[in-house]
């Protein structure tokens, strides 16, 4: 069953443009290369960055992403600009 994860980040004040550039150049293509469906991003009030990812085996694919040498080699790593993370697992019914 395809599962979705909603991710909401609070980005450091003044860093949204840098975060978006780095995320688009590195995180999104890496996720997509590992079979993730990526929707978004959306930017909201209070420096909020919102996106959705989906995969048929979300937990295993997420573990592969974080263990990948490509993820470890991200430079600059956009995660340094994230101040708060909220994640929600979703299933379509």
List where the protein language model places each region.
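Short, structured motif recognition centered on aromatic/hydrophobic residues
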Residues: 3-8, 19, 30-31, 49-53
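Active-site rim elements
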Residues: 16
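An amphipathic, aromatic/His-enriched active-site/gating alpha helix that lines ligand/cofactor pockets
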Residues: 22-41, 54-90
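Short strand-connecting beta-turns/loops that link adjacent beta-strands
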Residues: 45-47
């Amino acid at each position: 069953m395809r599962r979705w994860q909603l991710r909401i980040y609070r980005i450091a004040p003044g860093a949204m443009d840098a975060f978006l550039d780095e995320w688009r150049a590195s995180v999104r293509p890496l996720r997509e290369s590992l079979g993730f469906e990526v929707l978004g991003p959306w930017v909201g009030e209070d420096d909020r960055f919102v996106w959705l990812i989906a995969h048929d085996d979300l937990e295993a694919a997420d573990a592969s992403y974080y263990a990948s040498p490509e993820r470890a080699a991200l430079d600059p790593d956009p995660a340094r600009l994230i101040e708060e993370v909220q994640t929600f697992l979703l299933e379509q019914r």
